A protein has these predicted regions:
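Conserved Rossmann-fold cofactor-binding substructure of NAD(P)-dependent oxidoreductases
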Residues: 36-51, 60
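Conserved SAM-binding motif I beta-strand of class I
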Residues: 15-16
Length: 354
């Protein structure tokens, strides 16, 4: 909804969703209730549009992107899927399609910042810490999900890849917890998550890179218990003669508990630290984001959504024209535009240079 409303200020926007209930919340925007997991439905729908903005659950993200590219339409996407997006690069080039992936906050804005500095300095270290949390810390979960619950659970089981001394290291998710202090928030806990994604390939010249997720301290313990007990497993088990995947049951049970209710507020926190040499001198840059629920809009929707709409504007206005799959770091040259676009909408990144 945030993205549709923002884009509708300057463009003719149509929102498509499988849920009529979701569409009913959008005032003054054209809506179509349809199932975009069906290729034919999707490709017929997008025939007369200049740009597709994708925001679907991860399990259907890759296929949706492929279907859009096959139809020859430009796409800017924030869906987080486990498949390698570069698998669609050849197809996108054949079809002459501009396809920008992972256009959220991290991956997303973090990559744009990285790409911007990579063109100006020799980076040796990149660290990104990021989390979206409820302002009110409540037992037992101390967490609320603004994404599809199965995507959140996926983060807790997908092995985390990071780069140390130019070697890729894989560890299990939720490992290497650290307590970290943040102004205005206090102590949060970080742990390894698989957020580097495309950077492992595109920034292979940077010897040290890591991305970690932030939660309230102690949250990791119960997640590890649930994981070790099999609640996040995709392998079917038989219960009273019915075969079910434990992860589906867990998502079903947790979603109402994790869902943000009316009156709930969230915040997004991100800290990026880059170290290296610039003009022959050792430097470090630290970017800090603390964004809070504002104007009845979820912070995570603002921080991810406005990054995506900034890039959508660049593509639809012909200012970003690189054909093929583009991870956000390729848009480093448009950093100032995206940063200003976010600032105009109240999402402010503060930078400290040392």
């Amino acid at each position: 909804g945030v993205m549709a409303k923002d884009l509708a200020k300057q463009h003719n926007v149509t929102s498509v969703d499988i849920s009529q209930k979701n569409l009913d919340k959008l005032e003054g925007i054209n809506t179509i209730c349809a199932d975009v997991s069906n290729r034919e439905t999707l490709q017929n729908l997008i025939k007369y549009f200049d740009l597709v903005v994708g925001a679907v659950p991860g399990f259907m993200g890759y296929k949706m992107m492929k279907d859009v590219i096959e139809a020859g339409k430009n796409i800017v996407d924030i869906s987080f899927y486990s498949e390698d997006p570069f698998g669609l690069d050849k197809l996108a080039k054949e079809k002459g399609v501009v396809a920008v992936m992972d256009c959220g906050v991290a991956p997303g804005m973090g990559n744009i910042i990285f790409g911007h500095h990579d063109s100006k300095m020799e980076i040796t270290d990149y660290e990104c810490l990021v989390g979206g949390l409820p302002e009110k810390r409540e037992w037992p979960y101390e967490y609320q999900a603004v994404f599809s619950p199965i995507d959140v659970i996926e983060e807790y089981i997908r092995p985390a890849r990071y780069v140390q001394n130019s070697h890729m290291i894989t560890k299990e998710a939720l490992s290497d917890t650290e307590l970290i202090e943040f102004d205005e928030i206090g102590t949060l806990e970080s742990w390894n998550s698989d957020g580097l994604r495309s950077l492992i390939k595109t920034m292979a010249h940077v010897p040290n890179m890591i991305e970690k997720t932030l939660r309230y301290p102690g949250c990791v313990e119960y997640l590890k218990v649930l994981r070790a007990s099999g609640f996040f497993s995709y392998d079917e088990v038989e219960v009273n003669g019915t075969m079910i995947r434990p992860v589906d049951m867990t998502a079903k049970l947790l979603f109402p508990k994790w869902e943000m209710k009316k009156g709930d507020k969230d915040f997004t926190v991100m800290r990026i630290i880059m170290k290296g040499k610039e003009n022959g001198k050792e430097v470090s840059y630290q970017y800090n984001l603390l964004d809070r629920f504002d104007n009845d809009t979820i912070s995570m929707a603002r921080t991810t959504g406005f990054t995506c709409t900034a890039v959508a504007n660049l593509v639809v206005n012909g200012e970003y024209e690189r054909v093929g799959i583009s991870p956000p770091e390729y848009l480093g040259g448009h950093f100032e535009f995206v940063k200003n676009y976010l600032e105009e909408r109240g999402v402010k990144y503060k930078v400290i240079k040392k």
